[in-house]
Amino acid sequence: MVYFKTLLDGNSSLGEILAHRYETWSSRMVIEAVLIPLVHCPLLWKILDIVIFTSLPVLLCGLLGVTGRGRWFVTGLVLLYPFADMASAGWIATTTNYLWPLWGVLVIGMVLKQLRCGRKVPVWEAAAAFLACAYAGSQEQAAVLLLLLLGMEVLHYISEKRMKQPLLYALCGIDIISLIYIFSCPGNAIRSAQEMAGRMPEFADFTFAEKLYMGLANVE
């Protein structure tokens, strides 16, 4: 987090910093466009993070249709998460890179549920879904998760012959653009090579199945 705090201390603008990060380290420009200013305003981050974390069980209950005492169960499950893990790379950096994209995926899930139920999505909710998709899609794992989620929704409406879903297609477009951006980012390739050389040089020789297993397994 100290690193991000020093980025705006020089003469470079936020746009120049993000462009440099894109070329040399990361494609998470939407996330970092939020992260870097928030590092200089920790009070605002605290307010936003509290709102996001406390709304997680609300979103989960809404998605799963949980009511009554079941809401307390879902809330308890959320509270079981060892939140100290969010300090691994600094509180602001870790939450904005991992917790907030998860929240964005849940927001999109709620909007998709409304579409499934045939309800009209208000303009402000559609706008929130677009912002959530752009933000969550900036994080690699969340972008892939959204692709699967949105893809399944498209197949569902195709099977039901309900093809007029402009909001869904717009979300798909945002996520696909995000994925193209991720895969074409030179900084991601540079970071991957540096991390591999410094942490696990033999990783390049692993099979796809071995890499997939390592990605899914707990390697603590």
For the regions a language model picked out, list residue spans one by one.
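Membrane-interface micro-motifs in multi-pass membrane enzymes
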Residues: 24, 28, 71, 75-113
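Short hydrophobic alpha-helices at membrane interfaces in multi-pass membrane enzymes
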Residues: 114-134, 163-169
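Structural signal for the C-terminal ends of transmembrane alpha-helices
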Residues: 59-67, 81-84, 108-118, 151-163
